[in-house]
Amino acid sequence: MAVNTYDVIVVGARCAGSPTAMLLARKGYKTLVVDRATFPSDTISTHLVHPPGVVALQRWGLLDRLTATGCPPIDTYAFDFGPFTISGAPGTDEAPVAYSPRRTVLDKLLVDAASEAGAEVREGFTVEDVVIEDGRVTGIRGHGKGGATVSEGARVVIGADGRHSLVARAVEPEQYNEKPPLLCGYYTYWSGLPMNGRFETYIRPDRGFAAWPTHDGLTLVIGGWPFAESNANKKDIEGNYLDMLELAPAFADRVRAATREARFAGTAVSNFFRKPYGPGWALVGDAGYNKDFITAQGIHDAFRDAELCVD
């Protein structure tokens, strides 16, 4: 039988898990947050934080830390539909800008904030199993790198471990509003492609691509096509990616003058909602609901989930 060593155990320490652990610890709950990764480390993400997410960082006292890393603000969103472009400020007077911090920076900042708030952080810890007793989640079993399996108990276990959540698999929540993958997208980073504080997206028939600035003078450029074309297009990702950019010739010229600084990364994701709570457990972030990344809402939604869960 698991002993309730902790009030809450959070599985996953990235954009959903660390804020959840931080806010719980600030309220005085004895909190453990675990992740199989160590930090700083990267993950597949286009890492755009829309203004509502920026406001959350400000509420938590973390925005100044982010801006101190040199992440450039994004003060204009422009949507190019071909015949016309709609552009304007992305936010409000309270939250006028967006940011796109690299996950190596943002996730480390959030993990450190959770630790400073009093949460116990275990990096490099792999959860093997969720402990369920009499229909209620009571803890986890797992191990550190090279270590023996240990059990930890808690009143509540929160799954912040992404769309392939081990916690969700263990508790088997109702899943609804399911949609298959609709889009396949790839992104990479370019130097010599100044954005001057702009997020630019281009909407074309069966294609969409966008660009925005991030750390170290780099610009993230992502493009996508229908999932039905994914198998054919993955045979030449770079060629199909560059061909797609030609649908906006002036933008393609800017990319040709730039230098690619990283490999292509990409994915296609299914869309679903899961019931996010039950006896002794809850789900936050992509573990609770996952949506096509064309919205770039994942980080903002993870922050919102953290606050809703703790409240």
Task: Name every feature range the model reports, one short phrase each.
Residues Q58-K108:
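A conserved beta-strand/loop capping segment in the N-terminal third of enzymes
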Residues A113-F251:
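Predominantly flavin-linked oxidoreductase catalytic cores and closely associated redox partners
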Residues T69, N231-D311:
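FAD/FMN-dependent oxidoreductases across multiple families
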Residues A2-A16:
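Beta1/beta-strand and adjacent pyrophosphate-binding region of the FAD-binding site
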Residues A25-S45:
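Glycine-rich FAD pyrophosphate-binding loop
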Residues A16, F39, H164:
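Conserved Rossmann-like nucleotide-cofactor binding loop
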Residues V8-V10, T31, W281:
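Conserved hydrophobic helix-helix packing surfaces used for dimerization/oligomerization
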Residues T38-Q58, L62:
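Conserved N-terminal glycine-rich FAD pyrophosphate-binding loop of Rossmann-like flavoproteins
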